[in-house]
UniProtKB/Swiss-Prot annotation:
One of its GO terms (molecular function) is tRNA (uracil(54)-C5)-methyltransferase activity, 5,10-methylenetetrahydrofolate-dependent. This is Methylenetetrahydrofolate--tRNA-(uracil-5-)-methyltransferase TrmFO. The lineage of its organism: Bacteria, Bacillati, Bacillota, Bacilli, Lactobacillales. It comes from Streptococcus pyogenes serotype M4 (strain MGAS10750). InterPro entries: FAD/NAD-bd_sf, MnmG-rel, MnmG-rel_CS, MnmG_N, TrmFO. Catalyzes the folate-dependent formation of 5-methyl-uridine at position 54 (M-5-U54) in all tRNAs. Belongs to the MnmG family. TrmFO subfamily. FAD binds at residues 13-18. It is an enzyme of class 2 (transferase). Its cofactor is FAD.
C-alpha cells in the first residue's frame, strides 16, 4: 500500500494517547484532524467532554527514578509530553507519587489542543477506519461498538478483553477526622494520605461483609478476566483473607501517630490493616479510596465502605464502576512504532495496544505520534533504545507471545539488562538502569 498524499494526519480519540499523539504531530508542523465523539455521544464511564480525562484514579504513580514508571515519566518530559507538562501544572500532594487535580489537568490539556493553530477538533463519532490519510487510532478501552467491530476484523475477528474498575470518591467534609491520621508510607515525601486504621476485629468484619456483598452483574457470555493492577477489591478479598493485607490495606510503614487515641490491638504501634485515602482535586475537598476499585452494587458500596473507620457517615460523590477493556493482538498486528503491519498508513495507540496504565497509554501515543509524523515527512521510523522505558514497552507488546499476550505496565523486567556483573542491591540496580536509560535517550535524540 502506498503512502497517503493527504496534507494532514487523522487522530481518532482524544484520551491520553490520542491527545499526546495529536500534540506530537502538530509540534512537528503537520496539520491534525483530531476526532472525539464525546460531546455528541457519551461513553459509559467518562464524566466530561474534556480530553485526556482520567477515569479510574487520579494518580500517575511513583515519581522516583528507581521506579520504572518514574523513569518513563522522566523520559516523556524530555520528549516534551503534553500529558506530563499539564500533569505537573496540576499536581496535588501524594507523597512519593504523582497525582493530579483531574478536572484542572484535563481542562488544561483540552484548552491547549483546542487552541493549537494546527489542530482541528472535530466532535463526531468515527465508525469506519479512515483511508484518506495517515491515521492514529487511539479510541481506548471504551471504543464505540461500530469502530471496535472494524478493529476486531483486523484482529482476525478475535476480541481480547479484560475488566478493570474505578474506585469511589468521597467528600472530605464527611470524613470523621478524629478516627484517621495524615501520613505517607514510611514518611516518604510530605504526609499526603488520610489513613483509616483497623483493628483485627474490624478487619475481619469488613472482610466478611466485602466477600458477601452483592456485585453488579456481568454479561452472562463474558468471563471475569481482570487486569491485576486494577482488580476489584472484592475479587482480591475472595482470593484469601490476608490478600488485601499485602495489597491496598497493607499497614507496613503506617504506624499510629503518638497522639492517636482510637481503638487498637493492645500496644501494637502499627494497625492490623489500613485503608488509605488520597486527595483527588486541587482544592482538597475530594478523596478517593486507594486501591478500592470495585464492581459492587452502589447500595452495597455505601453499606460496606461505611464500615471503614472514619467513613461511617461518608458521602460518596462517585461510586466505583467497572468497564470492559478491549485490546489488540499487537504481537501479530503492530510494529515497534505501533504501526499496522498490514496498512503502513495506520497507527494505534493507548490501552487497545496492550499497554496498561495512564502513563503507558500516553507514552504509546507519544511514540505513535512521532512516527506518524516521520512517516508523513518520509523520514525513517524512530525506534527508541530497548535500554529505555519508552523503548522497552512498545518492544514488549509487539514481541510478546501472542497466545498468552496480556496488557502490561512498564517495569524494569522488560528493560534490557545492564551489562557486566549483576548489581545485587535492587535500588542501586534500578538507579543504574535509569541512569543508562536517560543517557541513551539523550544520545538518541541528539542524533536526530
Amino acid at each position: 500500500m502506498s503512502q497517503s498524499t493527504a496534507t494532514y494526519i487523522n487522530v481518532i480519540g482524544a484520551g491520553l494517547a490520542g491527545s499526546e499523539a495529536a500534540y506530537q504531530i502538530a509540534k512537528r508542523g503537520i496539520p491534525v484532524k483530531l476526532y472525539e465523539m464525546r460531546g455528541v455521544k457519551a461513553t459509559p464511564q467518562h464524566k466530561t467532554t474534556n480530553f485526556a480525562e482520567l477515569v479510574c484514579s487520579n494518580s500517575f504513580r511513583g515519581d522516583s527514578l528507581t521506579n520504572a514508571v518514574g523513569l518513563l515519566k522522566e523520559e516523556m518530559r524530555r520528549l516534551d509530553s503534553i500529558i506530563m507538562r499539564n500533569g505537573e501544572a496540576n499536581r496535588v500532594p501524594a507523597g512519593g507519587a504523582m497525582a493530579v487535580d483531574r478536572e484542572g489537568y484535563a481542562e488544561s490539556v483540552t484548552a491547549e489542543l483546542e487552541n493549537h493553530p494546527l489542530i482541528e477538533v472535530i466532535r463526531d463519532e468515527i465508525t469506519e477506519i479512515p483511508d484518506d490519510a495517515i491515521t492514529v487510532i487511539a479510541t481506548g478501552p471504551l471504543t464505540s461498538d461500530a469502530l471496535a467491530e472494524k478493529i476486531h476484523a483486523l484482529n482476525g475477528g478475535d476480541g481480547f478483553y479484560f475488566y478493570d474498575a474505578a474506585a469511589p470518591i468521597i467528600d472530605k467534609s464527611t470524613i470523621d477526622m478524629s478516627k484517621v491520621y495524615l501520613k505517607s508510607r514510611y514518611d516518604k515525601g510530605e504526609a499526603a494520605y488520610l489513613n483509616c486504621p483497623m483493628t483485627k476485629e474490624e478487619f475481619m468484619a469488613f472482610h466478611d461483609a466485602l466477600t458477601t456483598a452483592e456485585e453488579a452483574p456481568l454479561n452472562a457470555f463474558e468471563k471475569e478476566k481482570y487486569f491485576e493492577g486494577c482488580m476489584p477489591i472484592e475479587v482480591m478479598a475472595k482470593r484469601g483473607i490476608k490478600t488485601m493485607l499485602y495489597g491496598p490495606m497493607k499497614p507496613v510503614g503506617l504506624e499510629y501517630p503518638d497522639d492517636y487515641t482510637g481503638p487498637r490491638d493492645g500496644e501494637f504501634k502499627t494497625p492490623y490493616a489500613v485503608v488509605q485515602l488520597r486527595q483527588d482535586n486541587a482544592a482538597g475537598s475530594l478523596y478517593n479510596i486507594v486501591g478500592f476499585q470495585t464492581h459492587l452494587k452502589w447500595g452495597e458500596q455505601k453499606r460496606v465502605f461505611q464500615m471503614i473507620p472514619g467513613l461511617e457517615n461518608a458521602e460518596f460523590v462517585r461510586y466505583g464502576v467497572m468497564h470492559r477493556n478491549s485490546y489488540m493482538d499487537s504481537p501479530n498486528l503492530l510494529t515497534e512504532t505501533f504501526q499496522s503491519r498490514s496498512n503502513p498508513n495506520l497507527f494505534f495507540a493507548g490501552q487497545m495496544t496492550g499497554v496498561e496504565g495512564y502513563v503507558e497509554s500516553a507514552a504509546s501515543g507519544l511514540v505513535a505520534g512521532i512516527n506518524a509524523a516521520r512517516l508523513f515527512k518520509r523520514e525513517e521510523a524512530l525506534i527508541f533504545p530497548q535500554t529505555t522505558a519508552i523503548g522497552s514497552l512498545p518492544h514488549y507488546v509487539t514481541h510478546a507471545d501472542s497466545k498468552h499476550f496480556q496488557p502490561m505496565n512498564v517495569n524494569f523486567g522488560i528493560i534490557k539488562e545492564l551489562e557486566g556483573p549483576r548489581i545485587r542491591d535492587k535500588k542501586e540496580r534500578y538507579a543504574a538502569i535509569a541512569s543508562r536509560a536517560l543517557a541513551d535517550l539523550d544520545t538518541c535524540l541528539a542524533s536526530l
